[in-house]
Amino acid sequence: MSRILVEDDNATPFHSMEIISSSLTLGQLLKNVSDVRKVEVGDETPVHEFFDRDGSSLDGDNDHLMRPVPFVLSFNNLTYNVSVRRKLDFHDLVPWRRTSFSKTKTLLDNISGETRDGEILAVLGASGSGKSTLIDALANRIAKGSLKGTVTLNGEALQSRMLKVISAYVMQDDLLFPMLTVEETLMFAAEFRLPRSLPKSKKKLRVQALIDQLGIRNAAKTIIGDEGHRGISGGERRRVSIGIDIIHDPIVLFLDEPTSGLDSTSAFMVVKVLKRIAESGSIIIMSIHQPSHRVLSLLDRLIFLSRGHTVFSGSPASLPSFFAGFGNPIPENENQTEFALDLIRELEGSAGGTRGLVEFNKKWQEMKKQSNPQTLTPPASPNPNLTLKEAISASISRGKLVSGGGGGSSVINHGGGTLAVPAFANPFWIEIKTLTRRSILNSRRQPELLGMRLATVIVTGFILATVFWRLDNSPKGVQERLGFFAFAMSTMFYTCADALPVFLQERYIFMRETAYNAYRRSSYVLSHAIVTFPSLIFLSLAFAVTTFWAVGLEGGLMGFLFYCLIILASFWSGSSFVTFLSGVVPHVMLGYTIVVAILAYFLLFSGFFINRDRIPQYWIWFHYLSLVKYPYEAVLQNEFSDPTECFVRGVQLFDNSPLGELTYGMKLRLLDSVSRSIGMRISSSTCLTTGADVLKQQGVTQLSKWNCLLITVGFGFLFRILFYLCLLLGSKNKRR
């Protein structure tokens, strides 16, 4: 038992009492108290009581306001079929005997059931039985039109937008930011999901209460951790994942295998937490692989599936009588679910499959209905004609479903009435601020990532500076400058490839958070760009300072500043391009392969290896799409734009030809002969090639260096927009 001390705004104790586990929801506390201080007198996780500001408990005349609002979730005849590719055989090669190359596979076949608030419904079965598919169907994560059947809450069909607000879905994998502490992780979830109108102190209060409810107080200040950083345990990670999705105290909670990969003790602790959440007034529906005896004692309803069919549906207590009636009684002192799953696997491997068990379950369900005609209906409420809209509103008034907000709302017609459903808890700029702060905090605790990238850029710049040290104004110097610029500009893009795994690592976090409107996709895209940009500035300055003066580039201070700008623009467009690809490709290795290949094509068509005028017409479009082309042409113009600078004088005319091996005297005589032949006096000091001539020879004549800079920056914005469209169209998080 724990003792909760409730205080007023002046921190003066005004009421103190011991709290029992049957008290009301945590959400109620947010509206009615200012602070909560826990004094441990045991190891039981505290549950909070509901108090008025004057310190008295709300009872008596107001008791009907606090009476639990009943919810019953029912699903009937859920059927889900998918088309799968069929293996080709010899007959498919014969035109007149060719059949369809796909066949229909049934993942769910007329699945029905129901559960209510305060209960845990567990879906069991072997791998491939349809557990996760059923959870996805109930959570509206299957595309509309693909799923047949109905899902209702209190007898009324659930609209997609309504379900988003009143429910939460916990994925099987614990995808969390590794360098955030448990407390920070839950606090960011509170900032995303709880309304802006709720003071930050109340949000902190909600987080602290949730930490106690999840039983992770000792790990509150510990980072989540990953392979390279020691953090919390697997069971604690799972409870944090659950906490993120129940921060707003949802009415319905879906979980996909919450005990997967955990030892028996950790699994029991997780389900024990779920039981507390259910007792606070939530409906818990989860899939589970093979629960232990202790876990089974916490479950209220079970559904066993076998290849999409229901083979058992009922309470755990009815398992022995069910299998005894089927002719396979469960031995004493044996785990009932293990016995049931072993029997189902054995039947699946037999000739008749589980058809007999499916039919027996149907008869057994009919016998139950005949012996007990009372269906699962809500108990009497203050208003027996309470609609779903009114029930949800009443639940919100009790403190359940702490969400809503200032970010705009949509009105849903439901059951003859309307209910304002908030689209987002926060306005656009608050989302950007919070997302940016979270990313910076997570990245700041991993300085080695920026350090390694900065070291790579500096080392690359140092190698280039020493290889192309102090280039002179000669024909060879011109060719070496061209090689330096081509390699340097392509390096800007290749070093951006490390941005690829960033979003791929965050993909499922992003999908989980946006699935329930934690924030807008546009907010994420802008925040991602804001967090990325400062590091690009450091990288640009590091490379520019390392190479500009060492290589001996022209232009002075203004030339250096433009050199910095075009490098920054190259980093920006390269980072945006790789970020866009990260929203398209599903795997890191595939992404790296695509990035390397496309950047190689960009370099090929940049104009360094082959001039624009010599590129075949059917490939010229790739030249204009090349990201390397524009920064390459910009630095060429920055270097060769001075009309007084000469790069080929007199006898240097022969340097890039076999005649370059001749002695200086022979070159002078040859130059004199050339002068007489063309009728023009050419001395050893005559300028034959200026910077403008070099640009013309390279085909750099269409755009100014500032236009090239703007186009490079524009490419960066274009790929950010394309990244947003990928997130908008490709992250619906639904099966088809």
UniProtKB/Swiss-Prot annotation:
GO terms for molecular function: ABC-type transporter activity; ATP binding; ATP hydrolysis activity. Its main location: membrane. GO terms for biological process: pollen wall assembly. Pfam families: ABC2_membrane, ABC_tran. It is a multi-pass membrane protein. It is found in: Membrane. The keyword Repeat does not apply. InterPro entries: AAA+_ATPase, ABC2_TM, ABC_transporter-like_ATP-bd, ABC_transporter-like_CS, ABCG_transporters, P-loop_NTPase. It comes from the Eukaryota. Keywords: ATP-binding, Membrane, Nucleotide-binding, Transmembrane, Transmembrane helix, Transport. The chain crosses the membrane at residues 410-430, 449-469, 484-504, 525-545, 569-589, 590-610, 709-729. Residues 430-640 form the ABC transmembrane type-2 domain. PROSITE patterns: ABC_TRANSPORTER_1, ABC_TRANSPORTER_2. One of its GO terms (cellular component) is membrane. Residues 88-332 form the ABC transporter domain. ATP binds at residues 125-132. Belongs to the ABC transporter superfamily. ABCG family. Eye pigment precursor importer (TC 3.A.1.204) subfamily. PANTHER family: ABC TRANSPORTER G FAMILY MEMBER 16 (PTHR48041:SF11), ABC TRANSPORTER G FAMILY MEMBER 28 (PTHR48041). This is ABC transporter G family member 16. It comes from Arabidopsis thaliana. The lineage of its organism: Eukaryota, Viridiplantae, Streptophyta, Embryophyta, Tracheophyta. The gene is ABCG16.
